[in-house]
């Protein structure tokens, strides 16, 4: 990422994020609200450390010199297998300085659209968060995925219906936000959902003509529950280490989850992904695409729409190089055999 964008983000996010040279959760342990991990920060660090342990087998005797990064996930054609993760709450998570919630949402949605991928919109306390995300998706011509928190009662249904009205192709619920401390502190009712609740949500979203994905699956049994409930895609995620301390890293649990529901739902993953090499590792472990969170926040706060597009170009270049040096001609050829 451009040094000037990082420095601008560091100044604007002072007191909320240090924009460390290596974003591994060590300096910001316990800083929630903010951009850190909950408690000791162990789960945040586990995401980074789990990916760090994955090794790639370098191959240089092949014909894969111009790999094709394009893929299709949830029926969406993407220039590379990346989505910007749903993050909201600029004022209490990022500081942001002059960057408003609307500015942030526009930077993510429009920057991602410009680069041929898709951004996800956040939700939270205060209608401004989801309203700005919804409006940005509308500005992008429906090119975005709104995520809704697992609210209790009618609020969940109301927001699902409003999300569908943006013209989006997919709606998500980050079920792991049931443990988000920023919501608990503000007395907002979120809760875990039963299999029956999940099936009801899937039916409501499908009835609106959208596909349905959930974020926050960390076990094989819950992946099967999601598939049985009619969910179209799951994101293997521990919410960036922000909801439960001492969970494993997502890269540790991803392969078995993929094995449990292969062919039934699309499987995506997030957690500690910073560059193109990290993307390739997650794909080799079985993910069909990845969500990237904190670096997109840095890019959006520090550089706006152009900063987001430039960061995506960094990811594209890094993934191209990594695929070339592991002999992968296209995304479909990425498999566990490239792991050392």
Predicted feature locations:
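An N-cap/entry alpha-helix motif that binds or orients negatively charged groups
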Residues: 2-79, 334
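N-terminal functional module of multi-domain proteins
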Residues: 43-126, 130
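Active-site mouth loops of central-metabolism enzymes
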Residues: 85-101, 145-154, 210-218, 274
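Alpha/beta enzyme core
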Residues: 110, 139, 151-269, 276-299, ...
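Long, hydrophobic, well-ordered secondary-structure blocks that form the structural core
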Residues: 128-154
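C-terminal structured "cap/appendage" subdomains that terminate the fold
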Residues: 289, 297-300, 304-315
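Charged C-terminal helix
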Residues: 317-340
């Amino acid at each position: 990422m451009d040094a000037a964008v990082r420095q601008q983000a560091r100044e604007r996010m002072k007191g909320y994020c240090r924009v460390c040279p290596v974003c591994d959760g060590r300096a910001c342990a316990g800083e929630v609200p903010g951009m850190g991990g909950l408690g000791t920060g162990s789960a945040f660090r586990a995401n980074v450390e789990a990916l760090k342990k994955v090794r790639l087998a370098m191959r240089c005797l092949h014909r894969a010199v111009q790999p094709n990064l394009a893929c299709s996930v949830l029926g969406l054609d993407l220039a590379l297998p990346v989505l910007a993760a749903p993050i909201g709450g600029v004022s209490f998570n990022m500081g942001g300085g002059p960057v408003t919630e609307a500015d942030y949402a526009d930077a993510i949605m429009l920057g991602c659209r410009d680069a041929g991928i898709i951004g996800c919109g956040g939700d939270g306390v205060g209608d401004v968060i989801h309203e700005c995300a919804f409006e940005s998706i509308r500005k992008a011509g429906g090119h975005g995925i709104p995520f809704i928190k697992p609210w209790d009662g009618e609020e969940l249904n109301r927001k699902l219906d409003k999300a569908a009205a943006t013209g989006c192709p997919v709606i998500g619920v980050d079920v792991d936000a049931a443990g988000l401390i920023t919501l608990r502190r503000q007395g907002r009712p979120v809760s875990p959902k039963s299999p029956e609740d999940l099936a009801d949500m899937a039916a409501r979203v499908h009835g609106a003509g959208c596909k349905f994905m959930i974020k926050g699956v960390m076990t094989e049994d819950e992946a099967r529950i999601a598939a049985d409930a009619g969910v179209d895609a799951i994101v293997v995620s521990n919410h960036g280490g922000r909801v439960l301390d001492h969970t494993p890293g997502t890269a540790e649990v991803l392969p078995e989850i993929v094995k449990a529901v292969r062919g039934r739902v699309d499987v995506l993953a997030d957690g500690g992904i910073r560059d193109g090499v990290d993307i390739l590792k997650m794909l080799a472990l079985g993910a069909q695409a990845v969500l990237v969170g904190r670096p997109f926040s840095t890019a959006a706060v520090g550089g706006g729409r152009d900063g987001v597009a430039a960061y995506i170009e960094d990811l594209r270049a890094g993934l191209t190089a990594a695929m070339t040096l592991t002999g992968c001609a296209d995304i479909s050829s990425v498999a566990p055999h490239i792991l050392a």
